[in-house]
Amino acid sequence: MGSITRALPLLLLLLLCAHGTASQHHLRLRPLPSEGLPVPDLIENPDPEHDPREQDLSEKTLLKKLGSNFDANFMSIHLPAQLNASAPPELPRLPMPAELKKLDLTETPYGRRVKVGKKARRKFLQWLWMYTHCPVLYTWKDLGLRFWPRYIKEGNCFSERSCSFPEGMSCKPVKAVTKTFLRWYCQGFMRQKYCTWIQVQYPIISQCKCSC
C-alpha cells in the first residue's frame, strides 16, 4: 500500500514562477508524496492577504479554467445539504471474492468432516463477506477559500471494528482516484506579490481492503 500512496500526488503546492514580466508568469505544480490517505488537513497561513478577492471567485471564470476536470460527483461549489455522503455499511454490491466462494466448509482444520447444507453455507459466506468487506465511506470536506471548488467528497476506510475473524486486521486504502482542483497561489511580497489560480491534484480513496 505504501507504494500506492507514495505514487499519488498529494496536492499541493508550490512553485515556480518563471519567464518574463508579471503578465507572463507561468506556474508549475511540484507534487509532494503522500505517506497516507486520506490527505491530512492543510495548515494555512491565516493572513487574509493570501485569500482570493471577490472578483477572483467568479464561478463562470473558474469553471472555464477547470474545464472538463470539474466532477460534480466529487466536488461542490456550495456547501452540500448532506455532509455525510455514504449510507450505513450494507451487504457489498461487488461480486464475492473467488477465495471466499471456494472456501471449503465441510472439513475442519483438524481434518474432521462436517455436513453443511447449501442454504447454511450461502448464509455463512454472506456473513463472512459482510464482516470482512471494507467499504469506502464518503463525507464532504471543506478545503477552505483557497481551493475551488472548496468542497470535496473525501473517502475513508471503515474503521469502527476489525475486519478479520479472529480480530487483528483492519481496513486500509488500496486504490485512489485523483481529482483536479484549483488552488489560489501567491508568491512574492508587497507590491511584487502575484496571485493566481493553479491546478492541483487531490487523491481520494476509492477502494479499501482488509489488511494487516
Swiss-Prot record:
The record's annotation in InterPro entries points to: Cystine-knot_cytokine, Noggin
- Basic and acidic residues bias spans: 47-56
- Compartments where located: Secreted
Q: Which UniProt keywords apply?
A: Chondrogenesis, Developmental protein, Differentiation, Disulfide bond, Glycoprotein, Secreted, Signal
List membrane-spanning regions.
Answer: none
| Subunit-structure text | Homodimer; disulfide-linked.
Region Disordered, annotated ranges:
37-56
Q: Which organism is it from?
A: Danio rerio
Q: Glycosylated where?
A: N84
Q: Where is the signal peptide?
A: 1-23
> Is Secreted one of the keywords?
yes
Function statement: Inhibitor of bone morphogenetic proteins (BMP) signaling.
Q: Does the keyword Phosphoprotein apply?
A: no
Gene Ontology CC terms, in alphabetical order: extracellular space
Question: Which BP terms does GO give this entry?
Answer: cartilage development; dorsal/ventral pattern formation; negative regulation of BMP signaling pathway; negative regulation of cell differentiation; osteoblast differentiation
From the Swiss-Prot or TrEMBL record, give the protein name: Noggin-2
Tell me its family. Belongs to the noggin family.
The coding gene here is nog2
The record ties this protein, via SUPFAM superfamilies, to: Cystine-knot cytokines
